[in-house]
């Protein structure tokens, strides 16, 4: 929440690039961490889920363009984080998906809704019900990502893309509206 709050309060912001400095974007939650969570009361679980949703919604609602650079695996909650960005650029070797559904856990941070708005209900249903990890080319075909590049070019394209948004060459405001 502090990162989102810092971005919201920054008067000089023009755009946000979301990127991991590690080999992978975000693997998502460690499923073993869910065991103690599921032992909590229904109210405590709702509070946790709503809190995470609130943070992601605030990021999605930023008044500047946002781009996620997916440099490795972005799975489960990690992919849901990518979906909150206005645009997603993916490395050729990266993979995305919602594998938690194989365990009977539905995406809890808005991923189901965001993916269906971005890629269409048919593709979202396939992704959610399969729990499959998807290659970059497949994600691009269903519009789950906006571009696929060699990993060495990811940062460069991300910078160029956000600058095009800031300069008004890409209508990022329209994209925000389309995702709602």
For each predicted feature, which ranges?
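A structural preference for short, pocket-lining loop segments at secondary-structure junctions
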Residues: 1-42, 54-69, 91-95
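Hydrophobic, secondary-structure "cap" segments at the distal end of domains
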Residues: 112-122
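Glycine-rich phosphate-binding loop at the start of an alpha helix
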Residues: 28, 49, 53, 76, ...
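Glycine-rich beta-to-alpha active-site loop
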Residues: 56-103, 107, 127, 132
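Hydrophobic/aromatic residues within transmembrane alpha-helices
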Residues: 18, 30, 81-82, 139
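Amphipathic alpha-helical segments at domain termini/boundaries
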Residues: 127-180
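A glycine-rich helix N-cap at a beta->alpha junction
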Residues: 45-46
């Amino acid at each position: 929440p502090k990162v989102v709050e810092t971005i919201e309060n920054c008067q000089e912001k023009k755009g946000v690039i979301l990127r991991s400095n590690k080999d992978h974007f975000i693997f998502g939650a460690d499923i073993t961490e869910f065991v103690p969570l599921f032992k909590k009361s229904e109210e405590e679980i709702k509070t946790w889920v709503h809190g995470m949703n609130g943070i992601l919604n605030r990021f999605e609602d930023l008044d500047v363009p946002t781009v996620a650079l997916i440099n490795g695996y972005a799975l489960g909650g990690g992919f849901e984080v990518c979906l909150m960005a206005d645009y997603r650029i993916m490395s050729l070797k990266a993979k995305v998906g919602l594998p938690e559904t194989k365990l009977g856990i539905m995406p809890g941070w808005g991923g189901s809704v965001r993916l269906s708005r971005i890629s269409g209900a048919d593709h979202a249903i396939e992704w959610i019900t399969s729990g499959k990890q998807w290659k970059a080319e497949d994600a691009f075909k269903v519009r789950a990502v906006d571009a696929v590049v060699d990993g060495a070019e990811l940062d460069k394209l991300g910078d160029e893309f956000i600058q095009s948004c800031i300069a008004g060459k890409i209508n990022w405001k329209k994209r925000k509206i389309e995702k709602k």
